[in-house]
Amino acid sequence: MLRNMVQTARKYKKVILVSTMIIGIIVLSFIAILLRFTVVTDYAAHHLFKDPERSIPVGNVIVSPADGTILYVKKIENGVIPEVVKKNVSIPITDHLKTTPLRPFENGYLIGIYMSTYGVHITRIPISGTIEKQIIFNGPHMNMTDAEIRIILTQMIPGMVTLRKIFGLMPYDIEDVADYILKSARETTVIADTRGKYVYVVRIADYYVGKLLTWIKEGSKVQTGLKYGYITWGSQVDIFFETSPGIDIRVTEGDVVYGGETILATY
């Protein structure tokens, strides 16, 4: 009988030992996952969800809708953009907006703002007015990583953007990796501004952008600098605005701009 008790004890001891090892592995794995999740959430809190205070300028101004780098400043004539992706290849404005303008867009400007992965991803209203329309284009979410790498490498060399422009080149060598500008999914927000003109803000989705978050709706009255949305991981925001007497563009390609604060144009 004693022998049976000892054998039973040994058997249960083995079961307890194995069970303890399994539980230990599970607990350690859970701790490792938790620590990894903490690192991820800490990264997200410090790098992705930045929302700094901004000094909103007053007066007859159009401010940047996003933080980033000016990729291009294009003058639009007769509804045609002289070039965006391919040098010397013009495109109609509808190819970019993925919709027909609310009225014929004859003359105006297009300014493209590339947002850094590590920058502020809040988007802001560029000019006071009323939200006339919001259009979603459910195209592919194209990868912008190659474009961002080339932009960063160019910015690391002092004077390179200026030098490229002097030689008649695009400020950033992204021509062969910039198809996302016209093909990627996007949201176009149309603002009827205080001039009686239309301003089109186009938020372009990156491969890593799950959704373009929007906190306004059609018919909303909005003020310059108002936070109206968020783009995960950064991406690109382009702005189209019609010309008007006395309009003056205040930025150039290669400039760093801050959403709600940097003046793109005065009128």
Model-found features: residue ranges?
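Contiguous, well-folded functional domains in the mature portion of proteins
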Residues: 1-267
